[in-house]
Design a protein with these regions (language model features):
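Intrinsically disordered, low-complexity, repeat-rich regions
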Residues: 1-150
Length: 150
């Protein structure tokens, strides 16, 4: 989709390393949603968006692949999507997640609704990520400074 199959497998492996009991299919779904989330943020700078707790796990895995993540952000329009974690996993604002899913849909993808639920719902997947983003921690994109420009 936005990265090569080899890169995808590597990021999926990172999700599985952090969540040893997780099936490869679920980890792949989480990476897919993380990619969609980053794209939605990069294409909508200035609009506060946030991932669900499960999708945040995929975003974390992408970020750990620093070169891949920087290249992804460049590909998406040179909008580096920074991560500002909110550490209270009970922080949950459904309208922000609704807005984020709408932006994903506007880009031509379908959000995997099962992965965009409340942080307390671990029936589908329990993830290592324990942060949840809320109104005071939505993601606002700022352009990355160009090398040599102060």
């Amino acid at each position: 989709m936005l990265i090569t199959d080899e890169q995808f497998a590597s990021v999926r492996g990172t999700v599985m390393d952090a969540n040893p009991d997780m099936a490869a299919q679920m980890a792949g779904r989480i990476v897919d949603e993380g990619l969609k989330f980053v794209a939605a943020c990069a294409k909508n700078p200035g609009l506060g968006l946030a991932p669900s707790r499960i999708v945040d796990e995929g975003w974390h895995a992408l970020i750990l692949h620093t070169a891949l993540y920087a290249e992804l952000c460049d590909t998406l329009g040179d909008q580096f999507v920074h991560h500002y974690p909110g550490y209270d996993p009970t922080n949950y604002d459904p309208p922000i997640l609704d807005r984020t899913r709408e932006k994903i849909t506007e880009l031509g993808w379908e959000a995997d609704q099962e992965l965009w639920g409340p942080p307390s719902d671990e029936t589908l997947a329990s993830v290592a990520a324990k942060c949840q983003h809320a109104p005071d921690c939505t993601i606002i994109i700022t352009p990355r400074p160009k090398p040599g420009v102060a």
